[in-house]
From Swiss-Prot:
GO biological process: retinoid metabolic process
GO molecular function: aldose reductase (NADPH) activity; all-trans-retinol dehydrogenase (NADP+) activity; allyl-alcohol dehydrogenase activity; glycerol dehydrogenase (NADP+) activity; prostaglandin H2 endoperoxidase reductase activity; retinal dehydrogenase activity
Gene that encodes the chain: AKR1B1
Residues reported in the UniProt entry to bind NADP(+): 10-19, 211-273
Compartment annotation: Cytoplasm
Role summary: Catalyzes the NADPH-dependent reduction of a wide variety of carbonyl-containing compounds to their corresponding alcohols. Displays enzymatic activity towards endogenous metabolites such as aromatic and aliphatic aldehydes, ketones, monosacharides, bile acids and xenobiotics substrates. Key enzyme in the polyol pathway, catalyzes reduction of glucose to sorbitol during hyperglycemia. Reduces steroids and their derivatives and prostaglandins. Displays low enzymatic activity toward all-trans-retinal, 9-cis-retinal, and 13-cis-retinal.
Alphabetical UniProt keywords: Acetylation, Cytoplasm, Lipid metabolism, NADP, Oxidoreductase, Phosphoprotein
GO cellular component, one term: cytosol
Binding site residues for substrate: 111
A family per Pfam: Aldo_ket_red
Name of the protein in its database record: Aldo-keto reductase family 1 member B1
Catalytic activity, EC: 1.1.1.21, 1.1.1.300, 1.1.1.372, 1.1.1.54
Amino acid sequence: MASHLVLYTGAKMPILGLGTWKSPPGKVTEAVKVAIDLGYRHIDCAHVYQNENEVGLGLQEKLQGQVVKREDLFIVSKLWCTDHEKNLVKGACQTTLRDLKLDYLDLYLIHWPTGFKPGKDPFPLDGDGNVVPDESDFVETWEAMEELVDEGLVKAIGVSNFNHLQVEKILNKPGLKYKPAVNQIEVHPYLTQEKLIEYCKSKGIVVTAYSPLGSPDRPWAKPEDPSLLEDPRIKAIAAKYNKTTAQVLIRFPMQRNLIVIPKSVTPERIAENFQVFDFELSPEDMNTLLSYNRNWRVCALMSCASHKDYPFHEEY
């Protein structure tokens, strides 16, 4: 199993990264330090997670202590929906860089295709609980992203939560300067995403799988929701390999040639999630896990379902 996938830019992106969505600010600095000490070199961040400053403290300590060199780290962040208007993109990126205490990002993604009304509120809602859109078009947002590459603020740019028609719209943009290097999407055995993954690969776009464990700590979880970590069928596969269910769920996307970014702030779990390079799921077990697809999403962003750029009305 390769430890990296190569982006079309030639950059090597570590196949396993530390996710930081829902990592509490008080715990994420330590999580980042532990992860780097354990060998993680890829950290996945976003402005909307409201913890980039604390992630940055962990990075800064390890860089200043010369535990790791900047060029050996792969740091990803994301442009939030309230900053899609072209004149806001650079400032948003600079805020993230300042918080992370870095002078460049390895990869910067448009977090969602949906633009929201600019302002301090990350989810501006109207009286009916629907998100208030902005006037932006993500193709124009993309042009501002391209400028960040030219200015040296970011090494590569990509998208997240885009369906294949939305990716296609960027690829077909007249005068496109840089195509998306990555599409970061939700992928796990209940949402296997075969069609979208196949489409991205056919265009030379690397796919990052988020919520590989089904994000059991998501704030909107309901008791009746399915649980990947508690699924007896997946537990049985894990037992066969002498591995935990989480390790099988992390290995599964890796063997599909996807990047994967499990989140944890618990040192033991951060270590456990990295112990996935010493076993291989059989083709039969891979197919079995794929067969559990039920098109179940952790992140459906239902408050945006009426937005013109909502990505999940399409099949893929």
